[in-house]
């Protein structure tokens, strides 16, 4: 199906609820949308994919009536809002009452200091009766599992909790079309699941959903998928149709869904399976071919697949024992509450963010902190970076207590803090000036500052962008520019708060490559992440729950079968390859070990199938035309 046909198709007997025809929109000299034509049917769920800067958020703003294009025609919920180069403002006002939008960043949408008041803000502006508003607020807070926080201050909530409040506020206006601009980018596993359950429920009540996302698996439940590239529709169709163009999808800076990637890996290894992006279909096919397999001499090898997440750890595991160096970070019985004033007086209802945390971070290690939103991960990072000090207990970084005001100044150049969405800290006129700010404030000479700026920009792949405005870079490039400013200070410890959140797959891959290189060169990394696949790459994983560290160990230890129920109860998941392996085992397959990557899982499956006589699945020849 062609991109144009798929993007514009709608039932002939039914007028589309959203219609864009040859829409063009530019920001100055930058063309954000370039001749986009798109029809969305009533009750349809449409997913919009694309790399950072492809035009997704601009398209979302046009669909929800926030932006008028420069050219083309736009019809929203039956209102012709733009045609013949002019906007009809009365039509826009009528249409906006039936349109809802959830922004990418919840801070841009929250307007009050109490959760229930924020959810009520939209219905109040529609002039609804108070009793109706009260009903809507209760219903939508319950829908997003935030009813217990009705009286809370949104500023005191975690990022994921704030996002759920904005979704409730949009739904409280009962829109006919709801536009979601990456609503789950800052959520934990439980939060993402709850949001996607809400999205699925909307289908049953006839609400049309236009969903912008960087998570390929979220797109699998859509009726149609549209992929944008430089403001144009590059691919469109059902999820299976779009993702079957694997090479083209990768060329657009995206990635295949997990099932598509795994089935391709299996075909590359000669296993005769059909390519699919349907995880249940792949599971069923593999279960038929592997169930009841007897234990084989290869089983022991399979059990070790994926349990070592890095070559460095594998080398260290076989090296002779040696005395452990002093940890880069040591936290002892750390307690912290946001309810304390500067004079350290406790407010009676102060929430306890950290409650007796103990954690050692080995020098040169990569440590991942995981936990549901509100578990204390970001708070612990701030304390490690000496941005706050513990109420009780002690944190030492490189042997220096963060509570020692006189000595902790030495940490300013040694600890780099990469905040959530670090691009928000950009401020200078040029990229070079922004990156130079930190080393300049360390008192370095102009020549040394220039050298550090050049090396940092080379490291993050922004060579040649010295004189560009950081605000004209793509979202992914802005993230790298902010990281370069931190790296230019030469830190031995990087603490990163969800560094890949909001990045497209290519941006995530580039950032992971940079961080892996820094870690291999000796930089200690402490990273907060909601992606279990990212946590699986670390040397150590620490799980926080209720302000406490409740599990620590290697990824294989933390994600082991004995912890599965405990992790589930805490609202966490496990890496997708490991979850799929366990689902296969539940379906009757022999144990596949603990594969933490799709490559390790594919190896384990092929090994198992290859040792079972008479399996329905066969090993295809390398020349088999079905191999991709």
How does the language model describe each region?
Residues 165, 170-171, 486-487:
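ABC ATPase C-loop
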Residues 131-149, 447-465:
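Conserved ABC ATPase "signature" region
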Residues 178-181, 494-497:
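Catalytic Walker B motif of ABC-type/P-loop ATPase nucleotide-binding domains
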Residues 73-94, 394-410:
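ABC ATPase NBD Q-loop/coupling interface
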Residues 64, 385:
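Helix-to-loop junction immediately C-terminal to a conserved catalytic motif
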Residues 172-176, 488-492:
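A short, proline-enriched helix->beta-strand linker immediately N-terminal to the Walker B motif
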Residues 153-157, 161, 469-473, 477:
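Conserved ABC ATPase signature
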């Amino acid at each position: 199906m062609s991109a144009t046909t798929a993007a514009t198709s709608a039932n002939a007997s039914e007028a589309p609820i959203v219609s864009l025809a040859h829409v063009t929109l530019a920001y100055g000299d930058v063309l954000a949308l370039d001749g986009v034509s798109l029809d969305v049917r009533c009750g349809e769920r449409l997913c919009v994919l694309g790399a950072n800067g492809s035009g997704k958020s601009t398209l979302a703003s046009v669909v929800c009536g926030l932006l008028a294009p420069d050219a083309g025609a736009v019809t929203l919920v039956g209102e012709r809002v733009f045609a013949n180069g002019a906007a009809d403002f009365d039509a826009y006002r009528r249409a906006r009452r039936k349109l809802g939008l959830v922004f990418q960043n919840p801070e841009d949408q929250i307007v009050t200091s109490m959760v229930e008041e924020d959810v009520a803000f939209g219905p109040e502006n529609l002039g609804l009766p108070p009793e109706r508003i009260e009903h809507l607020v209760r219903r939508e807070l319950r829908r997003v599992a935030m009813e217990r926080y009705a009286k809370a201050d949104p500023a005191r909530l975690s990022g994921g909790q704030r996002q759920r409040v904005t979704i409730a506020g949009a739904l409280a206006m009962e829109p006919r079309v709801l536009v979601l601009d990456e609503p789950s980018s800052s959520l934990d596993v439980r939060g993402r699941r709850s949001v996607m359950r809400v999205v699925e429920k909307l289908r049953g009540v006839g609400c049309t959903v236009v969903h912008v996302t960087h998570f390929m698996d979220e797109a699998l439940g859509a009726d149609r998928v549209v992929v944008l590239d430089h403001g144009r529709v590059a691919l469109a169709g059902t999820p299976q149709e779009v993702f079957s163009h694997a090479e083209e999808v990768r060329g657009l800076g995206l990635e295949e869904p997990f099932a598509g990637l795994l089935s391709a890996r299996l075909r590359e290894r000669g296993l005769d399976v059909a390519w699919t992006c349907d995880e249940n279909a792949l599971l069923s096919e593999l279960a038929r071919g592997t169930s009841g397999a007897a234990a084989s001499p290869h089983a022991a090898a399979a059990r070790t697949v994926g349990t070592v997440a890095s070559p460095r750890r594998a080398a260290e595991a076989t090296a002779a024992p040696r005395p452990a160096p002093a940890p880069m970070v040591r936290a002892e019985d750390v307690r912290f509450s946001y309810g304390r004033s500067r004079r350290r007086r406790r407010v009676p209802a102060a929430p306890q963010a950290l409650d007796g945390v103990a954690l050692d971070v080995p020098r040169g290690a990569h440590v991942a902190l995981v936990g549901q939103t509100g578990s204390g991960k970001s708070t612990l990072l701030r304390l490690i970076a000496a941005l706050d000090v513990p109420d009780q207990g002690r944190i030492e970084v490189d042997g220096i207590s963060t509570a020692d005001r006189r000595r902790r100044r030495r940490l300013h150049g040694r600890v780099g803090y990469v905040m959530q969405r670090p691009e928000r800290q950009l401020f200078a006129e040029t990229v070079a000036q922004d990156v130079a700010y930190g080393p300049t404030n360390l008192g370095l000479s102009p020549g040394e500052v220039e050298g550090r700026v050049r090396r940092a920009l080379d490291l993050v792949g922004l060579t040649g962008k010295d004189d560009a405005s950081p605000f004209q870079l793509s979202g992914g490039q802005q993230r790298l520019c902010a990281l370069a400013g931190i790296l230019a200070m030469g830190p031995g410890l990087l603490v990163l708060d969800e560094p890949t959140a909001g990045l497209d797959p290519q941006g995530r891959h580039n950032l992971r490559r940079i961080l892996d290189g820094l870690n291999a060169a000796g930089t200690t990394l402490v990273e907060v992440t909601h992606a279990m696949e990212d946590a699986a790459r670390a040397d150590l994983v620490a799980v926080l729950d209720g302000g406490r560290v409740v599990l620590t160990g290697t990824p294989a230890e933390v994600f082991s079968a004995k912890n599965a129920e405990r992790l589930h109860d805490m609202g966490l998941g496990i890496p997708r390859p490991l979850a799929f392996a366990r689902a296969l085992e539940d379906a009757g397959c022999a144990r596949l070990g603990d594969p933490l990557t799709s490559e390790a899982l594919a190896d384990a499956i092929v090994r198992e199938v290859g040792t079972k006589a008479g399996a329905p699945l066969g090993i295809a020849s390398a020349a088999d035309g079905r191999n991709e």
